[in-house]
């Protein structure tokens, strides 16, 4: 899953990004509101972490513009402002959660998981497709009750597919979940990851189906 982090303090951005990457997420870092507004308008994120006090365009305006476009991506606001009126303002604009600075990285990670659990899993702890199970808190896939050994890229592809049941995902859509803004997104490499995943899933009652010219679908099999 791909997360956008918008924070103008370089050291804080680096530490938060590293913590999220260590937890297994793909993270894009931006440092101003205009860049964030552009990215949120063109990229597909599972979650946005948005500082209020951004240069060029503050976090409140970025959030307001995001919701005005009809985007429902969950947003966690970071703020050094402790006033209730600021938190209320952000929540009224469409923020999903607030975290006041300074904060512990463990609390931020817990809030990220809670937001993703609500938005991706509908409040559930796990997603299932056949005998493939994904646990959001541990970010582990199991097949027939055995842990799957996946690379970070394979994990990102499989997360994207299991989070969108019944939906055919194009190579470009999958690539957007695998590669960050500072990486060259390769749709062709998705074929390689899908091939590897098929090998790892073949003993279970789940498969990745190819729809030529459209993309891939993760589905349970009857046998």
What are these regions (language model features)?
Residues 122-126, 149, 192-194, 198-223:
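DNA-binding patch around the recognition helix
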Residues 106, 172, 188:
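Residues within helix-turn-helix
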Residues 1-123:
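N-terminal/domain-start alpha-helical segments
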Residues 177-182:
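Short helix-coil junctions and helix-kink-helix linkers
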Residues 157-158, 174, 197, 201:
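DNA major-groove recognition helices of helix-turn-helix
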Residues 153, 186-188:
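N-terminal positioning helix adjacent to the helix-turn-helix/winged-helix DNA-binding module
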Residues 2, 110-172:
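Short, Lys/Arg-enriched segments at the junction into DNA-binding effector domains
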Residues 24, 165, 205:
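Short glycine-rich hinge loops at helix-strand junctions in the catalytic core
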């Amino acid at each position: 899953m791909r997360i956008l982090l918008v924070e103008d303090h370089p050291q804080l951005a680096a530490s938060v990004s590293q913590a999220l990457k260590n937890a297994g997420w793909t993270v894009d870092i931006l440092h101003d509101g205009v860049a964030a507004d552009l990215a949120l308008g063109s990229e597909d994120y599972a979650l946005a972490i948005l500082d209020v006090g951004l240069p060029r365009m503050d976090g409140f305006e970025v959030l307001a513009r995001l919701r005005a476009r009809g985007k429902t991506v969950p947003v966690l606001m970071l703020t050094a402002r402790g006033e209730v009126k600021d938190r209320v303002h952000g929540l009224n604009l469409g923020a999903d959660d607030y975290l006041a600075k300074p904060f512990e990285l463990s609390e931020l990670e817990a809030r990220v998981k809670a937001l993703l659990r609500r938005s991706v899993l509908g409040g559930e702890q796990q997603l299932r497709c056949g005998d493939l199970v994904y646990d959001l808190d541990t970010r582990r896939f199991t097949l027939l009750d055995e842990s799957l050994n996946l690379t970070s890229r394979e994990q990102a592809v499989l997360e994207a597919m299991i989070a969108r049941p019944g939906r055919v995902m194009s190579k470009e859509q999958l690539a957007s979940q695998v590669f960050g803004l500072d990486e060259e997104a390769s749709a062709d490499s998705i074929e390689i990851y899908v091939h590897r995943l098929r090998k790892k899933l073949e003993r279970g009652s789940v498969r990745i189906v190819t729809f030529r010219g459209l993309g891939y679908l993760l589905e349970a099999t009857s046998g």
